[in-house]
Amino acid sequence: LLNIDKLPGLTTIAQRMTTGIDSFALLAIPFFILAGEIMKRGGIANRLINFAKSLVASLPGGLAYVNVLASMLFGAISGSALAAASAIGSIMTDRMEEEGYPRTFSASVNITSSTTGLLIPPSNILIVYALASGGTASVAALFIAGYLPGILLGLAIMGYIAFIAITKGYAKGKRATLFEVWTFFRKAFFSLMLLVVVVGGIVAGIFTATEASVIAVLYAAVLALIYGDMKMKEFPEVLLNSAKTTAVVMFLICTSMAVSWLFSFEGI
């Protein structure tokens, strides 16, 4: 315990860390992370990967493109780069190794492509930015603004993958027929609809980002149970993993709030 008479600065820092995350808007972060974990366990991530593979796997270095596109789709649904890296990476790393891609290359692609989730809505970072702006920037406006840079970042990563794939002679995958593309799209349709429901609802003003995150959890949970890839007995582990990820993210936010106050107080 601290002597507040002698250490007022440390007391203030602790207060700033606590008040920094005392916001209703920040409740969206743990819920979006939970939605991402449910999608990972519930087979939703697999369906997104298969749909992405049907679109771009025939290009040189095809599985790397699949990784990027699947990360963009998953990040656009879960709102979390961590969730995208975990869900897509846990599936794609082994698949890419089986196809002869170096593990370092597949890991690099997964790490860089997951950052598109920081920009493509619903993004946890944009929610934090809206909060830090003191209300001058709306979440809906930031979400609309995040699409173009997020897509451009994904295309830039794909462009570099094309250069590496051609240089190193990575193999092409099998070209999917229109029927196969339609089949995988149909299987991923309800997963993709989550993006429309969440972002569309926020932009249209039907619900807030926090309310949208709860809807995302309920939608993902029902979908996972319908698909049958996740059982009720797995929910405690899903909640625990989500809590661990949330703890890391929220700790970063509260310490950044304290550092921001410290810089302001010291006139840096």
Name the predicted role of every residue range.
Residues L1-I268:
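Alpha-helical transmembrane segments of multi-pass membrane transport proteins
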